[in-house]
């Protein structure tokens, strides 16, 4: 039993990690001191005798030795042995990289006296973990009469307090990094642990690298110093390459085209589900991030915009898949005679019949001249009605160009109530939009200042001729009529 206990104790000591305390918390650690370099040579005659000196006095000679360590190390001691007693003046210099700059470590003047100084000289850096002599090259300069017989260097790998083991003979030397650091000298954080800036460990604080909060959707992140400052020094990591259709600094919301499934936790691979919007009934492939509701076209309803709403029926148009069901005896606007007794409608409309003489002046005063077909209508607030129209031809453009195809037009509710515009679904109209007032540049507006006349094929040629005259400059100098107010929308 005592033998078994001793073996378990030794095994526990061998497997203990010096970079973590018994509770598993990070702590400052250093690799062991090892022999970095050793140089030995025979002792030749340091300096030749001067031929003119019968007393045999020696001349002063100088020498230097540069050692390349193969990587950065923390030097702990430098031992020098000379061929004869009385070593010369010594200068030790260290450089962090090849080519310098060199930093003076130790300077020893020549020993006075005939016998000289000691045969061996040893330089020690600050003992313990506070050793600060970091170098990859060491230079020894000496002058005088003695020659250098041997030199030895001892030190440890530069791991910045984040490793207790090191492959010192590797080139460059590689530390077995802990505290979620990486690099030959543990000089940076792992790609997934960059929520705090990298710092070297100290005996008072190990400064481990902390993981970024990516909800298990990213394997790497980057450190942002500005976010770290704004957070009061709490967090500065930004997740990169979010997976599983997530996005954001912490991969905490879904990409466009996906929505958050509340039945799954945020760190689940199935936290984001595809919107599955209908390709014809929806305006696009995106949906609400919370509910998954797609943005439907006019008259279309459903979570994925896959059916027509109440009062609408399916059509064959991919751009307007649902049309309002027409009523048997009514149109979109009521005839003027039905409301002729309303005092507000008296002299309100532009009372013109279908016999319109389109002169060049009147053509130029219009905001737009279009041939369009009315498809459907729905209320858009208390003062406006939105019409779905299909523009078939454009004879006069607005300041904001009108394109051919399906789009929306806006009509004041009062103009329809008083019968200023007579519109029937499925019928082609010549739409004359007056430039009176200040039309919304982003919307196609039809009101009482313009006309909506049932289209007649014989109008096409005269309108083409007026269009050519406008392009030739025929509308220059023609002013629009006096403005009048429109309802707010």
Swiss-Prot record:
Keywords: Developmental protein, Disulfide bond, Glycoprotein, Laminin EGF-like domain, Neurogenesis, Repeat, Secreted, Signal. It comes from the Eukaryota. InterPro entries: Laminin/Netrin_ECM, LE_dom, LMN_ATRN_NET-like_EGF, Netrin_domain, Netrin_module_non-TIMP, TIMP-like_OB-fold. Residues 1-16 form the signal peptide. Residues 470-489 are annotated as: Disordered. GO terms for biological process: neurogenesis. It is found in: Secreted. Residues 345-475 form the NTR domain. PANTHER family: NETRIN-5, NETRIN/LAMININ-RELATED. This is Netrin-5. It comes from Homo sapiens.
